[in-house]
Curated annotation (Swiss-Prot):
<dbReference type="GO" id="GO:0005829">
    <property type="term" value="C:cytosol"/>
</dbReference>
<feature type="compositionally biased region" description="Polar residues">
    <location>
        <begin position="359"/>
        <end position="377"/>
    </location>
</feature>
<dbReference type="GO" id="GO:0000785">
    <property type="term" value="C:chromatin"/>
</dbReference>
<dbReference type="InterPro" id="IPR013083">
    <property type="entry name" value="Znf_RING/FYVE/PHD"/>
</dbReference>
<dbReference type="GO" id="GO:0005634">
    <property type="term" value="C:nucleus"/>
</dbReference>
<keyword id="KW-0479">Metal-binding</keyword>
<feature type="zinc finger region" description="RING-type 2; degenerate">
    <location>
        <begin position="125"/>
        <end position="168"/>
    </location>
</feature>
<dbReference type="InterPro" id="IPR019787">
    <property type="entry name" value="Znf_PHD-finger"/>
</dbReference>
<dbReference type="InterPro" id="IPR011011">
    <property type="entry name" value="Znf_FYVE_PHD"/>
</dbReference>
<feature type="compositionally biased region" description="Polar residues">
    <location>
        <begin position="305"/>
        <end position="324"/>
    </location>
</feature>
<dbReference type="GO" id="GO:0006338">
    <property type="term" value="P:chromatin remodeling"/>
</dbReference>
<dbReference type="InterPro" id="IPR047157">
    <property type="entry name" value="PHRF1/Atg35"/>
</dbReference>
<feature type="zinc finger region" description="RING-type 1; atypical">
    <location>
        <begin position="18"/>
        <end position="79"/>
    </location>
</feature>
<dbReference type="GO" id="GO:0061630">
    <property type="term" value="F:ubiquitin protein ligase activity"/>
</dbReference>
<dbReference type="GO" id="GO:0008270">
    <property type="term" value="F:zinc ion binding"/>
</dbReference>
<dbReference type="Pfam" id="PF00628">
    <property type="entry name" value="PHD"/>
</dbReference>
<dbReference type="Pfam" id="PF13639">
    <property type="entry name" value="zf-RING_2"/>
</dbReference>
């Protein structure tokens, strides 16, 4: 009962955080909560420490949200508009009061102030595009275009009126047209009126041409200032950057906290996967039952073959082995001479096949030998095949199956080649090399250590080896040996960073290109090399766009551009 009446204060680490002041929110009654981590401006009053809840479900300090509502009525986290605020005692605590919020309209701070474009007042030479050397910068009296005296090959500033080449050309064409029309209008009085109208029309067209020229000059000056504003912007940032470290760090923390909270709220709930049981009809069910019966029969055959192999082990290769014909005669003699043998034993004796009469004795012996060896190989091959079916299909089982298959093929042909005549042998099996001393017939006898040894033994001249088996084994060894060498941790440069670096390099190279110090191909080559070197420095951590090290990038780029120009001049 005491535990229910006096709840213990929760751990401050598990409490929520106010996104506005970045301090913990009380998750228990205020008299039991430690307010030392809250700023003094908030903890001075109980109403400021209370929790303000908005309709979107986010919690803030009431004091912080009141200050926020003076500017905007949107949630600081999800930007949802709200017109009402509920005040609680603590997070998920009892309701205390509520108050309305007025709808706020955001406005631009300097909307009433006129915008002054300083770049439009700058006069630049139409030919070279520069505004320096103002003492020799001439303004045309007709179209207000600016020209340097050295750009027009003039020795000094003219005292009388100055007209640009464009205006001179227009005036010449106008005078020529007027003179031709005046000469033609001398024939009559009516023609003179037409010449006056044509002259007025030409003057109007000339004025319109000059107006368009002024407009294009203003646009050109604005574009020039916009393209060359990056370097000056970084120079201004270099002076103001140390004073903004604290505020930028606080803003970064707020943005990161808001992002984490939004990810937690928008995290999708994983639904359990529904496993559908396949529906089978009567014919499919009967087929599966037949398949199970066949597998059961194969397992019984495998057990019988295993017992026979254990009771009658194969003699070693070092001992003397009898031929199948001698074994057959010995069994017949034993059953005939043994007085204790019964009729039941004679009925259980394995019947022998009658030999086909042949003129050659060796051919008959080889035929009997082939029959016996084929029966033995069929039994052992069937046993190994059933064991491979019962066991799971892995690379090790496939390897043992290929080894056993190779052994059985080689064993049958090697026994068949022991006869006196080689008439029935093909050239492929006549070149077979002697079989190894021991080849494992079961997948359990083959391990990862001696797998390569067996592959080497079986891959002798004249044998059939599965090339896919050898390739898979070598590929697996190379894959496991070089697995740790493929780990490569490299910091990639983002697309926005590359775009900013490329703009800085372009701005640094443009003056040299306009002065015809470098060609178009050299401009592209220097731009690519400098950008790649800066990308490498950013990846290595030598340069950085964060903190007070931003101004180093523009300085480094200017130095690299100067070095490239100097190397070009030296060459």
């Amino acid at each position: 009962m005491n535990a229910e009446e006096d709840p213990k204060p929760a751990d401050s680490d598990s409490s929520e955080e106010c996104i506005i002041c970045l301090s913990n929110l009380p998750n228990c009654p205020l008299d039991q909560w430690d307010s030392s981590s809250v700023p003094a401006s908030i903890s001075s009053t109980l109403d400021g420490l209370r929790i303000a809840k908005i309709p979107c479900g986010h919690y803030f300090h009431n004091h912080c949200l009141e200050s926020w509502c003076r500017v905007a009525n949107t949630c600081p986290l999800c930007r949802t508009e709200f017109l009402k605020v509920d005040v609680l005692e603590f997070v998920k605590g009892p309701w205390y009061r509520a108050y309305p919020v007025e709808e706020k309209t955001q406005s631009v701070a300097n909307a009433g102030e006129p915008f002054e474009d300083e770049g439009s007042e700058t006069c630049r030479c139409v030919i070279c595009g520069r505004s320096d050397h103002a003492e020799v910068l001439l303004l045309c009296d007709g179209c207000d275009d600016a020209y340097h005296t050295y750009c027009l090959n003039m020795d000094a500033v003219p005292i009388e009126e100055f007209y640009c080449p464009n205006c001179v050309l227009l005036n010449y064409q106008e005078n020529e047209t007027l003179s031709s029309r005046i000469s033609l209008s001398r024939r009559g009085q009516t023609r003179r009126r037409r010449v006056g109208a044509a002259a007025r029309a030409s003057r109007v067209s000339q004025q319109q041409q000059r107006a368009w020229t002024r407009a294009w000059n203003a646009i050109r000056n604005r574009a020039w200032d916009a393209l060359n504003s990056d370097l000056s912007y970084y120079g201004m940032q270099q002076e103001r950057l140390p004073a903004r470290d604290v505020s930028s760090e606080l803003l970064r923390r707020r943005i990161e906290s808001a992002r984490l909270r939004s990810n937690q709220l928008n995290e999708p709930v994983e639904q359990p996967r529904v496993v559908q049981t396949p529906v089978t009809n009567a014919s499919e069910q009967q087929a599966w039952n037949d398949f199970d019966e066949i597998l059961h029969a194969n397992s019984s055959v495998h057990s019988v073959a295993t017992e026979a192999t254990i009771s009658n082990p194969r003699p070693s290769s070092g001992r003397f082995q009898q031929t199948p014909i001698e074994e057959h005669h010995q069994q017949d003699t034993r059953f005939v001479n043994d007085p204790n043998s019964t009729s039941h034993d004679r009925r259980q004796k394995r019947p022998t096949r009658r030999h086909i009469p042949c003129s050659n004795k060796s051919s008959g012996s080889s035929t009997v030998l082939g029959n016996n060896s084929s029966s033995k190989s069929e039994n052992s091959f069937l046993a190994s095949l059933i064991s491979n079916i019962n066991q799971p299909s892995t690379s090790r089982i496939d390897t043992s199956f290929m080894l056993s298959l190779q052994h059985e093929i080689k064993n049958s042909h090697s026994e068949a080649s022991d006869g006196t005549s080689d008439v029935h042998l093909t050239p492929l099996f006549s070149n077979l090399s002697p079989r190894p001393s021991h080849v494992p017939l079961s997948p359990r006898e083959i391990s990862n250590d001696n797998l390569d040894d067996h592959l080497i033994e079986l891959s002798e001249p004249g044998e059939i080896v599965d090339n896919h088996l050898v390739n898979d084994t070598s590929m697996h060894q190379r894959r496991t040996s070089g697995r740790h060498d493929l780990v490569h941790s490299s910091k990639k440069v983002s697309y926005e960073t590359k775009y900013r670096i490329e703009r800085l390099v372009n701005a640094a190279l443009k003056p040299y290109y306009r002065e015809a110090k470098i060609s178009k191909d050299q401009f592209a080559l220097f731009n690519k090399n400098i950008c790649r070197s800066v990308y490498t420095a950013l990846s290595d951590g030598t340069l950085s766009l964060e903190g007070p090290q931003q101004h180093k990038i523009s300085k480094t780029i200017r130095e690299k551009v100067v070095n490239c120009i100097q190397s070009l001049s030296n060459d």
